C-alpha cells in the first residue's frame, strides 16, 4: 500500500484526527511502519504477549477474547477497521496484550514503533491530544463495562439496563 493511500485511510483513525493526508504522510515517513496480512480466524496475539508497537486495524475486523483456566472463553469485544488496538496498555509498566486477538475475516494491521510514535507526538500538540483522547476513551469504556457488570447481576437486569441506555440515545 502506498503512503498516500494509507494516509487517506488514516484520516479516519482517532490518532490522526484533524490531520490532512499530507501531514499524516510526513508522520508515516518517520514511523518505519509495516503492514501485515492475517487470514480469517488467525490468532494475531495471545494474552500476555509483549506490546511493543502501535497497532491499527486498516482492513477487516478482529475480536478479543479471554480464556479461563477451565477452558471457557469470553469475548471481550470486536474491533473493526480504523480502531487502535490496546492503546491504553502501550506505555504502561506492564505493557502486555490484555486478550487473545483473533481475526474475524481476512485483515490487514498497521504496526509502527511506539518510541518513534512518541517522538512524533512530542512534536505536535494535536497528535498528543489525539493519543490522550484515545486512551481516555478506552479507559472510560472499560469503566462503563465494569460498572454495568457490577450493578446488573442478572441477565434480566443487564437487558433492561441495555434497553434503557440505548432508548435514551435515540
Predicted segments with their positions:
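Cyclic-nucleotide recognition modules
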Residues: 31, 75-133
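Glycine- and acidic-residue-biased ligand/ion/polar-headgroup-sensing regions
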Residues: 41, 52-65, 70, 81-82
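Short phosphate-coordinating micro-motif centered on Lys-Gly-acidic
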Residues: 43-49
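Cyclic nucleotide-binding regulatory module and flanking cytosolic helices
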Residues: 1-40, 85, 89-92
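Short, small/polar residue-rich loop motifs at catalytic or cofactor-binding pockets
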Residues: 30-31, 49-51
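Polybasic "coupling" helices that flank or enter modular domains
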Residues: 104, 126-170
Amino acid at each position: 500500500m502506498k503512503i498516500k493511500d494509507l494516509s487517506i485511510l488514516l484520516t479516519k483513525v482517532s490518532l490522526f484526527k484533524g490531520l490532512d493526508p499530507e501531514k499524516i504522510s510526513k508522520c508515516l515517513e518517520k514511523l518505519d511502519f509495516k503492514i501485515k496480512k492475517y487470514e480469517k480466524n488467525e490468532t494475531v496475539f495471545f494474552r500476555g504477549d509483549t506490546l511493543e508497537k502501535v497497532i491499527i486495524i486498516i482492513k477487516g475486523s478482529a475480536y478479543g477474547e479471554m480464556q479461563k483456566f477451565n477452558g471457557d472463553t469470553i469475548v471481550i469485544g470486536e474491533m473493526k477497521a480504523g480502531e487502535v488496538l490496546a492503546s491504553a496498555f502501550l506505555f504502561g509498566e506492564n505493557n502486555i496484550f490484555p486478550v487473545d486477538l483473533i481475526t474475524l475475516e481476512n485483515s490487514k494491521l498497521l504496526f509502527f514503533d511506539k518510541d518513534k510514535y512518541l517522538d512524533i507526538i512530542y512534536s505536535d500538540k494535536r497528535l498528543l491530544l489525539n493519543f490522550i483522547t484515545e486512551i481516555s476513551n478506552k479507559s472510560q469504556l472499560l469503566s462503563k463495562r465494569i460498572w454495568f457488570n457490577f450493578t446488573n447481576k442478572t441477565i434480566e437486569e443487564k437487558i433492561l439496563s441495555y434497553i434503557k441506555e440505548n432508548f435514551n440515545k435515540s
